[in-house]
Amino acid sequence: MDRFRPLAVLIAAALTLSGTTALSSAARAADADLARNGGFEAGLDGWTCTAGTTVNSPVRSGSSALKATPAGSDNARCAQTVTVQPNSQYTLSGHVQGSYVYLGASGTGTTDVSTWTQSAPDWRQLTTTFRTGPSTTRVTLYTHGWYGTGAYHADDISLVGPGGGTEQPPAPPTGLRTGSVTATSVALSWSPVTGATGYAVYRDGVKVATASGTSATVTGLTPDTAYAFQVAAVNGAGESAKSATVTATTAPGTGGGSADLPPHALVGYLHASFANGSGYTRLADVPDSWDVIDLAFGEPTSVTSGDIRFDRCPATECPNVESDAEFKAAIKAKQAAGKKVLISIGGQNGQVQLTTTAARDTFVSSVSKIIDEYGLDGLDIDFEGHSLSLNADDTDFKNPKTPVIVNLIQALKTLKAKYGDDFVLTMAPETFFVQLGYQYYGTGKWGGQDPRAGAYLPVIHALRDDLTLLHVQDYNSGPIMGLDNQYHSMGGADFHIAMTDMLLTGFPVAGDAANVFPPLRADQVAIGMPATTNAGNGHVAPAEAVKTLDCLTRKTNCGSYATHGTWPALRALMTWSINWDRFGGWEFQRTFDGYFG
């Protein structure tokens, strides 16, 4: 890739002002510095930066300069788009300090250019030139560092050449007002702005939506929560200043999306088809503390068949297994006590790939048969391993194209429609398929990444209005980058806090600020933890579980990770598994009961 190769030659173009090829005096007069706030004297105005700020020292001139710090997969890119003339020559220059600092231009319509320095302990000027294409009217200027290196500085960035016209950013919108407000959404409208080609909507200072007209509905909100909204007008010259702020408080939750669960619920998996070394636990013997019981597992007859079967544990493996009649009676007794009993599909060994519409339809019919036979309350999706992955051209989580993703979404929507509003739908993805999407999504822009990275995001997003609970498995995980751009590892409260904060705050997918996965409601989110050290890697002591809950629901007892909010409505704790918790003396259950009462 070009970013691995510095330019062999820095082109210094000289304009010859003679003969028929000479620029006219009018064109020469039009040459100007088109970079907005290239000296960073107005902070980051005009620039979009992933990890940048302005500082007063060191500076090359004036009183401010850019400081940007790469971290993880973020190279600390700062960019702005300027209006240019077609078929015109431009000179881009800037002064930088640091190691592996780049300056470049993209969208030129000819050959995009960049230049760099390996080491600049003092201010060093970088310069490059380009010619725009026959229809180019906008070019993006950028500077960035390199992954894993230290902070870099930039100052006095300029783009000299013919101006692209007199277009200026539009005026800020006026008349911003709220309309219909539900438990999870707020409708907004505003007055039109002359010269605007679109609008950007901000929630609590973060861009969350764009609109071509003068209205938008912001979704994915938490019930009974106050939000602040602003809107900016957009045209070819950029964004306006933001409008005046309006506030709205979402309506209280109605309980329809939470399937009548208690305000705080305990979720556990019951080994119903195997013992797994922890011993078999009869459903009737599960204590009343457990609000949602996931029967593990329904598995496919083959990976791509879509034909799901639920076979109860054989007596040879589980000598104390109850009869089918006793099992069904126990389900009814749990339901009469207000508990939810679900069939969980997948697990470590039950890979499910709905590669065809026929497999999709078979999935729906076979899962329905299990639900109907046992009178269950709903379905848990625990697809692991290679069940979900993204095709190379599938880059937008809001509009997936990969058959295994699309067919799963359609199947779950069909089941939800069949069984109605009381149908309980939960999911238990691994961090690799969800939070890793903050850094990587599918195979990536240049290919070569694991296609499973972030692959659950389109499923969660498409079903967010139907989803009762998402309990990501915060265990058996490698280090995952949080919203602080630091890697977090299992074994303490910080990992659970950082992973859950990502779900409740939302995050740019693969670092793309224009492609944000919206937050889930707090009442939809549970934290997945292993019940004992035998159950999985990443077990934490009860004190660490309490720290996690304190920080997320009360913003107390927090560690090094700074959350982006406080969520007293956080719904649940989930564990693998009820059997292992019994094996460990019910420690997980006692921690939950002791905290929530």
UniProtKB/Swiss-Prot annotation:
The record's keywords, sorted A to Z, are: Carbohydrate metabolism, Chitin degradation, Chitin-binding, Glycosidase, Hydrolase, Polysaccharide degradation, Signal
Leader sequence segment = 1-29
For this protein, the record's InterPro entries field holds: CenC_carb-bd (IPR003305), Chitinase_II/V-like_cat (IPR011583), FN3_dom (IPR003961), FN3_sf (IPR036116), Galactose-bd-like_sf (IPR008979), Glyco_hydro18_cat (IPR001223), Glyco_hydro_18_chit_AS (IPR001579), Glycoside_hydrolase_SF (IPR017853)
EC class of this enzyme?
Answer: hydrolase
Q: Which reaction does it catalyse?
A: Random endo-hydrolysis of N-acetyl-beta-D-glucosaminide (1->4)-beta-linkages in chitin and chitodextrins
Question: What Pfam families does the entry give?
Answer: CBM_4_9, fn3, Glyco_hydro_18
In this chain the GH18 domain maps to: 264-597
Q: What activates or inhibits this protein? A: Inhibited by the pseudosugar allosamidin A.
Thermal behavior of activity? Optimum temperature is 55 degrees Celsius.
> What's an example of a GO molecular-function annotation for this chain?
endochitinase activity
Keyword Hydrolase listed? The answer is yes
**Which EC number applies?**
3.2.1.14
Q: Where is the Fibronectin type-III domain?
A: 172-253
Q: Which residues form the active site?
A: 384 (proton donor)
Domain of life from the UniProt record: Bacteria
Query: Describe its PTM?
Result: The N-terminus is blocked.
What pH dependence does Swiss-Prot or TrEMBL list here?
Optimum pH is 7.3.
The stated induction of this gene product is: By chitin.
Q: Where are the coiled-coil regions?
A: none
Example GO biological process: polysaccharide catabolic process
Keyword Hydrolase appears in the UniProt entry: yes
Q: PANTHER family of this UniProt entry?
A: ENDOCHITINASE
What's this chain's function? Exochitinase that generates exclusively chitobiose from chitotetraose, chitohexaose, and colloidal high-molecular mass chitin.
Which family, according to the similarity comment? Belongs to the glycosyl hydrolase 18 family. Chitinase class II subfamily.
Protein name as catalogued:
Exochitinase 1
* Gene name tied to this protein: chi01
